[in-house]
Amino acid sequence: MLFSPPYQGKVFGPPLGLLSLASSIREEGFTPVIVDGATTPNFLDVISREVTDAFAFGISVLTGPMIRDAIAASRVVRQVRPELPIIYGGWHPTLLSGQTLRESFVDIIVRHQGEKTLSEILKRQSTGASLDLVAGCWFKRDGKIVTNGDRPSSPLSSLPSPAYDLVDFESYARLTGGRKLPYATSIGCPYACNYCTDMVFYNRRFNPQTVSGVVSEILHLVKTYRLDEIALVDSNFLVDTRRATALARGFLESGVRFRWTFQASTDLLCRLSDDEVALLASSGVSHIGFGTESASPEILRKMHKSHQKIDDMFEAARKCRDAGIRVTYNLIFGYPGEEDRHRRETLRVMGQIAAKFENVTFSPNLFTPYPGIPIWPELLEAGLREPQSLEGWASVGLGQAELPWLSARASEELSRSISYFMLVNQMSKGASKMRSNVSRKAMRLLEKPLHWRLKHHAFALPIELWASMAQNWLVVRRSLLTGDALGRQMKEVQ
């Protein structure tokens, strides 16, 4: 049995990682059963009932709130089947394998890419063989942790296709309002951003599927399951721009129509000609998410993100606007070493982009310190408190961490400045869509005091924010994958 705890945010589609694991273990003769907490409200009852016949229980988990439900599910399994092996995998157990394995309800850790490792673990468990020397596996023997070396990543094209036949697409369609699917054409990114877990997990290695394989499989999936949208979960889809345009050309020439979205960096998008960006749009690309993070060159250097140029942020927005592609720019505030002047510079530049390009929206986030990232030792020196148990990490969700280098006053001003920036941006876009000149002028008048607040950093008595919150109108965060609204509240102004 494979379990995916419910994730913080909107559901987009089935858990791709578990589908990949299911396909691999099925090739070894095991029958996978997937429980997705996002679509199964009573997942603890389902697990308690279905685990009675299970050979093992596996959980894939990210750092943050998912951990809470992972622990609850593990305790249910321990109670119902005390002897059943409980296997943890995914980002968090890979980054903190030892701490995770110290928990009484965790028996085995699958580190990094898990398809081959999990298959080997289950085969050995079925014959009673030892897990010694199983690459990519840590486990407990007589209460002591045994560590094996990591398994080299397998080329994606060498792994079996995820078990999409196990998906009840109707249940996801009811939740999402459409027939959507996450899909990985590649994993890994060659950049060295020091806040990114991807760099630790994949060691800066780009691991793509073949163009022909991707085109063939996606077209098959779209036609077989009547899909409306494919969200590519690649870390940085445009690493190989020739490959990206070849995929787009393959989709376009097939005659099969569907929307698709991806994430990338603005410098790579700017390597494409306007005609190539237009090709992306013609093939179905409706949205691109960019990890712009900051408009302060000084902070970008601290992030080891010098490839990110301010001019590229404007040019990427222009290219996408001209092609008719929506764009979301992710922003990170509260980074170590960031000062008020850096934040003001970011909001100033992003305000210019917002005024010039109506296709651009923003998703500002408070810096989230994930374990094991390259900058981690510096964070501890700066006073960050590291949770000492698996359960402690459940409260470290996106934008929820306490950052000791950010004072209470600075945090309050940051929250309000972000909210005012987003409110101005949202009102401006709303005004541009109004047909009535009178309505447009009225909206522009309402914007003026908000611009004044941002310019002078005057955020006392934020009555405009309270009003917008009361109407549940202000969008604060968006999905980098699709641009869809994720959050409508900032904690400070509730």
Map each language-model feature to its residues.
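Radical SAM enzyme core and accessory elements
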Residues: L2, F55, P374-P377, P387-Q494
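Glycine-rich beta-alpha loop elements in corrinoid/cobalamin-binding modules
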Residues: G17, L21-P152, G372
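Flexible glycine/acidic-rich beta-alpha junction loops that bind and position SAM and/or redox cofactors
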Residues: G9, L96-S97, Y191, T241-R242, ...
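Nucleotide-activated donor-dependent transferases that construct or modify glycoconjugates
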Residues: M1-G9
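Residue-level recognition of beta-strand->loop/alpha-helix junctions
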Residues: S4, I34-A38, V200, G291, ...
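Catalytic cores of alpha/beta
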Residues: S97-E103, G337-Q352
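Glycine- and acidic-residue-enriched helix-capping/strand-helix junction motifs
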Residues: Q8-L18
